[in-house]
Amino acid sequence: MTHVPVLYTQAMEGLRVVENGTYLDGTFGRGGHARGVLQLLGPGGRLLVMDKDPEAIAMAERAFSCDPRVVIRHGSFALLAQLAAPQSLDGVLFDLGVSSPQLDVPERGFSFVKDGPLDMRMDPEMGESAAQWLARVSEREIADVLWTYGEEKQSRRIARAIVAYRANQPLLRTVQLAELIASVMLRTKSGACKSRIHPATRSFQGIRIHVNRELVDLEVGLEAALAALRPGGRLVVISFHSLEDRIVKQFISRHAKVPPTNRRLPEVQTFVPLLRMIGRAIKADEDELEVNPRARSAVLRVAEKLDVLEAVR
């Protein structure tokens, strides 16, 4: 059965693929978006696919190594500037967050439901695993990450429990950490049983984002995408939590809207918009949610690169 990504139809419409265009899928995953783009490209079109995850890249090579239109590169889309020349792309797609294969395979260490090694790295060869990081850093740093990236209100209590636990035995398994967090949440006034989500959801999110530098990569990748897009090219981003979406929304607004001015200060330079927002933020409808409950938090935003000469006229 072919995997259909979240908000697939809306993403394809947002990209507005032209037959001989050049496109980037910066988060290959299972390849659903890449296949959609290739169906719309002609023989003269080109698709660059990237992913941090070596397993995703292996899948891309199995699927598309014989297609001369496809160029496959292992790495974060934050490295886009090294691969694409300025104004060389007609469309860029980022489908953010953790992919279904990463969540569904316990050995990847992303799931708090299925037991596996406490890893959480999208590229297992890069940086520290979640277990290594939790064993090394201070209580304060753990709390800061859970609060900043997981928006976890009980971040200090959870961090304190982690440090106390690791003093006696190492945290090496996902369910081990999930059960520890659940025990902390059950002792709070809010109570884990009163929440609709698993008590470890926000903490796992925060640790995962930190370990993979997801928000840092997103900010760098958005700037690189803007530089690489041709005038008229489209930027399509699907985010899955408020931190990602806020960065995307603010990035588009910063390059599309005139910043507020202080009347008491002289105007130094004329603002030149580089992007145009295309429509409003899009969310999955009820029909899609029935098929794919993971789409509930997805938000899709589209922007179009402007011609600077046209923008200043």
UniProtKB/Swiss-Prot annotation:
**Keyword Transferase found:** yes
Single GO cellular component term: cytoplasm
Tell where it localizes. Answer: Cytoplasm
Binding of S-adenosyl-L-methionine: at which residues?
31-33, 51, 77, 95, 102
Q: Which domain of life is it from?
A: Bacteria
Q: Which GO terms describe its biological process?
A: rRNA base methylation
Spell out the SUPFAM superfamilies in the cross-references. Answer: Putative methyltransferase TM0872, insert domain (SSF81799), S-adenosyl-L-methionine-dependent methyltransferases (SSF53335)
- Output the Pfam families linked to this UniProt entry: Methyltransf_5 (PF01795)
Q: Which reaction does it catalyse?
A: cytidine(1402) in 16S rRNA + S-adenosyl-L-methionine = N(4)-methylcytidine(1402) in 16S rRNA + S-adenosyl-L-homocysteine + H(+)
Protein keywords: Cytoplasm, Methyltransferase, rRNA processing, S-adenosyl-L-methionine, Transferase
Q: What is its EC number?
A: 2.1.1.199
Annotated GO molecular function terms are: rRNA (cytosine-N4-)-methyltransferase activity
What protein family is recorded? Belongs to the methyltransferase superfamily. RsmH family.
Protein name according to UniProt: Ribosomal RNA small subunit methyltransferase H
- The organism is Xylella fastidiosa (strain 9a5c)
